[in-house]
């Protein structure tokens, strides 16, 4: 007999995880080779922002991706998981600006060069933290291909994309109304605007007609903008005002004459049906202003204060100006009344202040041609495929309703716009009429400018940077070497799958599909797997603003990486569904993750048992069992094992990752650990060498395959156990072993059904013993009143039932003589009974059951009264009412069981035996 191969008595996640993360990386097992013969499977990581550290949403997303990546690597695909980070222009700028403010300065005082030096230092620090956290998660990425959205290769891709779009007439510079964030002093895209419902006011103002014949009343939620009014509009079909169209009004406070116009955009039911028109500060007014050729009077400075066009109110903050304008209007008799009014106000998602619609010269992408091409791919080729498919409609609707994309940001951190103004043509100033050239670099720009304006020129590069989503939109192909035709680009583009949250379908997914389709002629990924959000213990979305996030590293330190990863994946009940993570903020404990750690410990202990009983032999030395030597329990566990292989593969292939994780849990904990290992112990401890070896072969086969099945979900612990099981060198790892394939001939549904009946029988006897208070170590008698079709199954499994239910005798038959004082339970079409006389104190048992019956009757009475109370049913939250109804049903069921038990003991209600 060889000395047993064993594992330590306890699993140490910290030691094991650190060891394998280092070995995986140093051995290069995750390095992608374009020449690998397997079919490509590529995912580029949704790049985390370099804004500090990863949060639980990242851990969730990365755990899902790693399941897909490890699985496809093990089935022989040519796998690339490319890591990287995003420069996050607005987010990082906000952090740096806050730091500078705390130091009593700002970026303008610091200067662009020093500011960018500081930004790069932040990126290095934050990026290092994020990479360390990704490594801590044990993700199987190819670190040799790590990318950053502002590294040299990706910057060249951004410059190329901008130049090509500009040359095609799809990028232009124009004066339009943009969403302006006074806090960050930058334009923001429509998608970076958060619409909030607020309780505000509606001010009714009186505008006098210049001919002295009367006045019009207008209603507004922003009275300070009336200083920039250039018209009052009414609906052309509104009989109340149609006769006034073409007349003029005197603008209060400003004493300016403005026209009354008719426009179908006006809602006659809003306010008085007359609306003030401020084209430079409202999107609808801007449209009307263009249609009627109204002057565009900008009132705002970039910091949210009023400019010189506001007259005496110049220099005031917009909200201070609001109060003073209202006070003046009231003092001069122009304020009619004020009403409370709930309405929607757009806020900057980053700056957290109300957006100011501002007339500004910006750079735009002409989006319609790009969106139409993406729509064509979706409608004709169903590309990309969304999982779940309901998101395809959301994606489509958004593409249909897109407006031109403002891509310039008044920031310094990011890709500086590759446009150079020929300022020598406008006295050294950059003005709206200053000519410019677009080029890849200043040398090329100078050559273009000289060709147009001669040698004596002065150039100045545009100071703005591109919207972060511009470079992110190129991520699936720029990371692979585009615009060059590299081996990686040829082999791994289009990507296979994108895994991302639904909250950035608009920000990111659509940008990538439009950019990919335009520049490469292909949608950049085949599938888009949309996952939900991670919610906290109160079912609220985790976010920085709510201050309810959970640091993944806290739970990793406490429970281990595998436990966190597995718990997050297992919680997914369906593609796109949110998950809930139980967490105690006082103790940093999570029942959800603790359950996954317990599962890891269960696997570890079961593996220790198997290894000890293999007596130093590896699966290779033991060989495979011969079918004629297999017992029924061997054939059952092998059937369950191959069923698990089949269902796990099917679920992963169809993105049912949560279902796959749950299925493996049930097979490993239930079928293998709780049942087969217990069933096989007598043979391992017996004298029959042949039976023992067959049991060892089955144990080794199932454990080896189970570790492979579970590896994508819990990579570290499975790698450690597999390595110990096979006693192989460090460079031979589970991560690249073939994933098990189901042997359909080994799957026996009839045998599985028979064992389900036997297992349910054992479980029922155990429950009856517990209800009766029978000591666990006491061997008792049991009877099975068996149906004709089930009797042979019970007979064949009698030895297993007796062994696992601790029975000294088991009688199986039909029409049995049933003794008095029994507990019974139904199993299938049969009944299981255990006699209690001489086994328990019957008087004490009756007393215990009666007390429990009395308690349940009181509970039922209380719950019934509560649910019959209309005040409770009508006023309580629906989930509270549903919980009370469920509690009542459970209590009634428990009482029925108690009463049945008392009758079995010969007790009618509360009478003694």
UniProtKB/Swiss-Prot annotation:
One Pfam family recorded for the sequence: Val_tRNA-synt_C
Xref: Gene3D superfamilies: HUPs, Isoleucyl-tRNA Synthetase, Domain 1, Valyl-tRNA synthetase, C-terminal domain, Valyl/Leucyl/Isoleucyl-tRNA synthetase, editing domain
GO cellular component terms, A-Z: cytosol
Location of the motif 'HIGH' region: 48-58
Main EC class the enzyme belongs to: ligase
Domain comment as written in the entry: ValRS has two distinct active sites: one for aminoacylation and one for editing. The misactivated threonine is translocated from the active site to the editing site. The C-terminal coiled-coil domain is crucial for aminoacylation activity.
Name of the featured protein: Valine--tRNA ligase
Organism: Thermosynechococcus vestitus (strain NIES-2133 / IAM M-273 / BP-1)
